[in-house]
Amino acid sequence: MLFDAVLLLSFGGPEGPQEVRPFLENVTRGRGIPPERLDEVAEHYFHFGGVSPINGINRALVDQISRQLESAGHPLPVFFGNRNWHPMVEDTVAEMRDKGIRRAAVFTTSAWGGYSGCKQYVEDIARARAAVGDGAPELVKLRQYFDHPSLVQLYAEAVSAAMSSLRGEARLVFTAHSIPLAADRRHGPELYSRQVHYLAQLVAAATGHQDYDVVWQSRSGPPQVPWLEPDIVDHLAALKDRGIRSVAVAPIGFVSDHLEVVWDLDNEAREYAQEHDIELVRAATPGADERFARLAVDLITEVVEGRPALRASGVNPVPGYGFSVNGALCSPLCCGVQED
């Protein structure tokens, strides 16, 4: 299978104060989120001038992917589209059609399976092609890459740097975005949480740490709905009660600095740590690192050349899915599960 373009598909984020509320309304459309909750979340964005870091990082990643494709001998145009804010994926796919693109590889900024990590991006692809209509390019979503060796190495280096900056014996804590327990059980089952735990295991092994914690962050929704726990701040409180005063937090659930990273960890978690005399260091995310861009090229090459998936080896490997064409569901154990 040959491609004549690449599409970087992401979540999106506002790039000015006037964009914050419309962006949040797009994100929460149809979910019945009360206006006062949107106002509360909007304040997180206003804290940073109404600008999410994600679009800037993704534009830099587009440039890196383009350079890595050229270095690999596969020069292709790289397009950028989002689910929730400009550039919207529908507009990007229309641009691709107008430029004569016939088949594009789609690399998403989510390494995971499950609904939020995989199926929503599949739905984005189907919606964009339907909006464009006749002449829309074939869009091939690349596989999940939570256990790609390059991703493991990037997180391992970030963890090592964070741990070495702390004094004394530090606790290693991995975080990822929480989701409702029912959603996690519906896919796999528990595909997403197992993938997160497996990546944590791989990164810990690569850094020589056998003892670590996996916790969750950024939950939302009604308090009576159970989500993956413990929350990072609650876990910091538990560590404090055990007398632990140095913590390295590694947000392995995120490939770049989403607002959830810079607000929930760099502000809320750090504020709690400072108030309770805990030294906290947050590990870096891959962002626009050239090795992360090469990971995307690896996934493309697997499809073009028919290579087997490049996956890190570890104890009790967890399945990965995600490959699909034109918004087709990827697997009965991931995307193929019917949503309620």
Swiss-Prot record:
GO terms for cellular component: cytoplasm. GO terms for molecular function: ferrochelatase activity; metal ion binding. InterPro entries: Ferrochelatase, Ferrochelatase_AS, Ferrochelatase_C, Ferrochelatase_N. One of its GO terms (biological process) is heme biosynthetic process. It comes from the Bacteria. Its EC number is 4.99.1.9. Fe(2+) binds at residues 177, 260. Disulfide bonds: none annotated. Involved in coproporphyrin-dependent heme b biosynthesis. Catalyzes the insertion of ferrous iron into coproporphyrin III to form Fe-coproporphyrin III. This is Coproporphyrin III ferrochelatase. It comes from Mycobacteroides abscessus (strain ATCC 19977 / DSM 44196 / CCUG 20993 / CIP 104536 / JCM 13569 / NCTC 13031 / TMC 1543 / L948) (Mycobacterium abscessus).
